[in-house]
Amino acid sequence: MKLSILSFFTFALAASAAPAGTGFDLVGFGKDNPVGPTTGGDQKGSKTVTVSTVPEFLAAINGTSPTIIYAKGTFNFTSRPRIGSNKSLIGMGSGAWITGKGLTILNATNVIVRNFGIRGIVDNDGITIQNSQRVWIDHNEFTSGNFPAAGPDAFDGQCDIVRASDWITVSWNYFHDHWKSSLVGNDDKFRDIDFGHLHVTYHHNYWKNEGRSFRSPK
């Protein structure tokens, strides 16, 4: 694992099954960067939609139009959804789950993912952030399920940030019962691509029962 400029603020231990903090303000590199704060879909002229089915979800995250998306229920994907730029993706209540396939943020900018449970994503990451800028991952729960019986290679990372991604904040998330957690930069062969990027802030996240310490905070 190769880390670039990585800012660890505070790793607060929460007693409940999800981060118990009341802080919802954006801090760190997702806010303080040369481009401007991560706002997601909260922009002038944006639209707001509520989705409860996979087709509605996929339609809402497509494209680059500023959109605030409220997601209700469980979304079991058979292929990885790719979130477009200028999106706020917000789970409603405690029952918003992503299963089957995880989320991809690729070649995008200005994306917020908040208040989801992301569970049992086989052979890939819960969230992959690749070559993307200004992303805020906030108040989510990540778990593999069937831990540790499934072994270390059934699942990949819970939230991986790679390939020159920049100006990222990961806050108030609960990572648990999983072999691999969260990495920043995934291969030395991408050193030239990553150089000068990978500004990432982690704060107030809780890691519990994670099976591989080299992908977890030290």
Regions from the PLM with identified roles:
Residues 86, 91-92, 109-120, 133-147, ...:
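Right-handed parallel beta-helix
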Residues 1-19:
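Fungal secretory targeting signals
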